[in-house]
UniProtKB/Swiss-Prot annotation:
Occurrences of domain Pyruvate carboxyltransferase (ranges): 20-271
EC number: 2.3.3.13
InterPro entries reported for this sequence: 2-IPM_HCS-like (IPR050073), 2-isopropylmalate_synth_dimer (IPR013709), AIPM/Hcit_synth_CS (IPR002034), Aldolase_TIM (IPR013785), LEU1_arch (IPR011830), LeuA/HCS_post-cat (IPR054691), LeuA_allosteric_dom_sf (IPR036230), PYR_CT (IPR000891)
Species the sequence originates in: Methanosarcina mazei (strain ATCC BAA-159 / DSM 3647 / Goe1 / Go1 / JCM 11833 / OCM 88) (Methanosarcina frisia)
Protein name: Probable 2-isopropylmalate synthase
Family: Belongs to the alpha-IPM synthase/homocitrate synthase family.
Length: 516
């Protein structure tokens, strides 16, 4: 057990002295995500962003796959980036030549080594596979470039044969070997044992490439580093073939924040980079995506949000803050929200309330949330404005009790309003050109002869998107003396929002007349 931050202990072995190289394959394996096709311009922009992020190696593409891909890799190679640009190649001279023509600084060559892939895809014997691998490595090294060799489907390859392959390419001059979990079948404990066994036999650096078919890509990558790997292959947002690859943000933040390892990643650009790739690929992240997702540092529960507001370490990792990854902390308002969070959110916007007003705002927020509505900041401020704009209960002339409306294509819109006026229950019914018009006429009628005002302003805004948008109604009333008051109300029901706004305005007018 060791401590990275005071009061927070971790039951793992630390890696403060270990440096891990980050190999990003978003532009190669990531682009193989079903439905994703990036333009050359987009790939170049992503490459610049990855360089800004600080990745050590960018696998820019598979040059032999198409002339367009080769030109894209070449443009990235010649973009003046600080990172090393890599091209993928099978153990074939034509593939490797395409990498040379793309001006890459590293060639990543591969060949299947598992029996199932070797027999059914390339139809070669074990001996022939070793010969192809060695010849490819030698060809790359003879041209003065760095070489990484991948034993494709390594995690389903006979362990003794795999070591034999790696020893052969190491002797041929390979700079680094890659152990790919090509179909994502490893579990962390098995990954640890495999990498530990390879590290005991091989002296050159070990890289891992983990797929996420069972959701274990990040965990397997971390176990590989624990066992001796010094380089991890990752993609932005975990995109890639099938279920994707190890996610860069999750892998890097786990390595640096939990293990204490070092990388060259400038973590403050993680969210920015994630959003760029999200926009260009069209693959939207679930809100609960770790590190970079919308909810990664969001809190709704009253207990959680109050704890975070007092001290963020209470219900956040503590060793990873939103600022570290370019994110921001959000207190999300909803049906689980407590008064503390609502008060904090209001005060951050300069809105002060007394206890009664705060109680009513919380009640309204929860009423809206219980209808399945997500509460935004705009919703909160509209609700707060409606509550703060009301007269206090003891100064209310009108206490609204009930509103009902009928409308349809063969019905005349009709509204019935029930309210208490100075302790007396009044009911009024009116028709109108629509349900809102009918309801407002009915509200005015409940005052009878005391109805000495005119509607000076009336505005309705949908302050949030969607069919369930919150209606924000603003009303201006003017009495016979020229006194003007304004009031507003917010409600998912546009009729109720309109009625509440008018009643609020009428009560404010009554309050001001009594105090004048």
């Amino acid at each position: 057990m060791y401590t990275l931050k005071e009061g927070i202990d971790f039951y793992i072995e630390p890696m403060q002295s270990k440096k891990v190289t980050v190999f990003d394959t978003t532009l190669r394996d990531g682009e193989q995500t079903p439905g994703v096709s990036l333009t050359s311009t987009q790939k170049l922009e992503i490459a610049h962003q990855l360089d800004k992020l600080g990745v050590d190696i960018i696998e820019a593409g598979f040059p032999i796959s198409s002339e367009g891909d080769k030109e894209s890799v070449k443009s990235i190679s010649n973009a003046g980036l600080d990172t090393t640009v890599c091209g993928l190649a099978r153990v074939l001279k034509k593939d490797i030549d395409a990498c040379f023509e793309s001006d890459v600084g590293l060639v990543h060559t591969f060949v299947p080594t598992s029996d199932v892939q070797r027999i059914y895809t390339i139809k070669k014997s074990r001996e022939e596979v070793i010969q192809l691998a060695v010849e490819a490595v030698q060809y790359i090294k003879d041209h003065g470039l760095k070489c990484m060799f991948s034993a494709m489907d390594a995690t389903r390859t006979d362990p003794e044969y795999l070591i034999e392959v790696f020893k052969a390419v190491q002797e041929a001059g390979c700079d680094i070997i890659n152990v790919p979990d090509t179909v994502g079948v490893m579990v962390p404990s098995a990954m640890y044992r495999q990498i530990k066994g390879i590290a005991a036999e091989i002296t050159i650096p070990i890289d891992v490439h983990c797929h996420n078919d069972f959701g274990l890509a990040v965990a397997n990558s971390l176990m590989a580093v624990e066992a001796g790997a010094s380089q991890v292959q990752v993609t932005i947002n975990g995109i890639g073939e099938r279920a994707g690859n190890a996610d860069l943000s999750q892998t890097v933040m786990s390595l640096t924040s939990i293990y204490g390892a070092k990388t060259n990643i400038r973590t403050e650009y993680l969210v920015e980079t994630s959003k760029m790739v999200e926009n260009y690929t069209g693959i939207r992240l679930p809100p609960n995506t770790p590190v970079v997702g919308q909810n990664a540092f969001s809190h709704e529960s009253g207990i959680h949000s109050q704890g975070v507001l007092e001290k963020s370490d209470t219900f956040e990792p503590g060793i990873m803050t939103p600022e570290m990854v370019g994110h921001r902390r959000r207190i999300v308002l909803g049906k689980h929200t407590g008064k503390h969070a609502v008060k904090q959110s209001l005060e951050s916007a300069g809105i002060k309330t007394n206890d009664n007003q705060l109680d009513e705002i919380v009640i309204r927020i929860k009423e809206i949330a219980n209808k399945g509505k997500q509460i935004t900041d705009a919703d909160l401020y509209a609700v707060a404005s409606a509550v703060l704009g009301k007269a206090s209960s003891e100064e209310e002339l009108i206490k609204l009790k009930e509103v009902s409306v009928m409308t349809g294509n063969i019905l005349t819109p009709t509204a019935v309003v029930k309210a208490d006026i100075e302790g007396k229950e009044i009911i009024a019914a009116r028709t109108g050109v629509g349900p809102v018009d009918a309801a407002l006429h009915a509200v005015r009628d409940i005052l009878g002869e005391s109805n000495h005002f005119r509607l000076q302003d009336f505005r309705i805004d949908a302050i949030t998107g969607g069919a369930d948008a919150l209606a924000d109604v603003y009303i201006g009333l003017e009495n016979e003396k020229g006194r003007i008051v304004t009031a507003r109300s917010a409600n998912p029901d546009i009729v109720m929002a309109s009625v509440e706004a008018l009643v609020n305005a009428m009560n404010l007018l009554y309050k001001k007349e009594n105090k004048s």
